[in-house]
């Protein structure tokens, strides 16, 4: 594989050290020589993002063998499945992961060669550095299985997706027209390289275009921003969650002042990228000042985020695909961005929309099949060669729009079909108080399960988030929705939804979550001081539920307006605390108890007097 003509150009940065393309290729050849990888064998890579991951990856390819890339966060128990299913003969790993590999092999009672890259001293491996043979990385043959990647899946056991070298080349060739990379580009290996999107987009393509990759020691927002500034990063590939976090931080800053709100509205109206780049120069400088565009993939991006970043002078190009299509099916041209679309179908890929709106795909990029699973392969690729994505969508003016998941459609007892994503998007657009929402059928009725943005709730001093969302958001949605799409129940939760490792919500687990059947993380020891114990006992008595130090008083305990009136009176009576919006400021039991301990007046002992409560002006909006 001819990667680059200028061997002295920097290929990688890691721990403040630069690795040239010549050094990169030589290190790859040394790994190959040292590990003696056999042709046509399966070899596993199980390590965190680091240069040795790419050396090992290309050494496997150079040997015309198959690379099995596994998520470095996988547990030993999960590893037993991957090792057993993939028939690997070598496992490339790191000091950080090796104990989990040993534990998995012990469980399986298998002997497989473990190669710990930290223990390989590349400087001690002798190789002819001037030999032309050692300055080239060979690629597998087109029909060879180059990769086996396991789908995380929202249900069932992971399946090993077999991708040929030609599958991968098809995507590289098709994306060439978009000029994703140029020789002067610098990107960051932010996403884990066991996924096909970052593996291709961050691990392979930059090297084919003579660009530069930066590896981070610390995956944190501070480390990311520092690296973007230090290395003058020009392009970044991320998932929607990354852009959501960045968007929230930027927009919170803009909305905090009237003048910046006005400037943003003005820039939005003018709708000129050139104007926005000047007026919001500080935003660009916050990302290092050299960003050309961002790329988003993995799941659908909220179109408002795309629009707002455009108003800020930054392009986000969205792509759509799946592991089984190597991965890209459609991609957004950086000079023709259409928010809410997944871009244009890429060259040499055919897409058609089935009668039931499912997106079907055919092309060189479609996988060879699932490893040792012909039945599952036959379920997803029909006799005519069309791969059934399971996604719903439409084609308009050459752009592909993904509208939902086929298996996530809700079929009501009256036969009506409901696309939950459509309702979720609509309700989310009506308020800034929702962090995440899932529309599901629970106890045979259409239910909105909402995880609020608790920081926003606190900032806006909302004491009863349930009633705010129910009456100010969901009820207003219901007033305009057809009867069969009306939300009949609202559940507020104080925890993240169960998700796959790439952040997709496991919708089939929502009912179990609501029923309390999902095991929660072990809690820290309970605090033990007077105010905490007394408030906790009171809450247990009135709600009849388990109460913990991190329990959200309103959401976890289901406190309604009358409960809140009584509780506020309890705090007044016992601690002399009459402060407004107390629960929104200190929403958990421990936060509230600590505040009471530090701010209580002389305690007044007495029992609750309902006559006094009912005569008291509560200012509560009762439904």
What are these regions (language model features)?
Residues 91, 352-353, 363, 368-369, ...:
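AMP-binding/adenylate-forming catalytic core of the ANL superfamily
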Residues 20-22, 146-172:
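Conserved AMP-binding A3 loop
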Residues 34-74, 236, 275-400, 406-409, 423-426:
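Conserved AMP-binding/adenylate-forming
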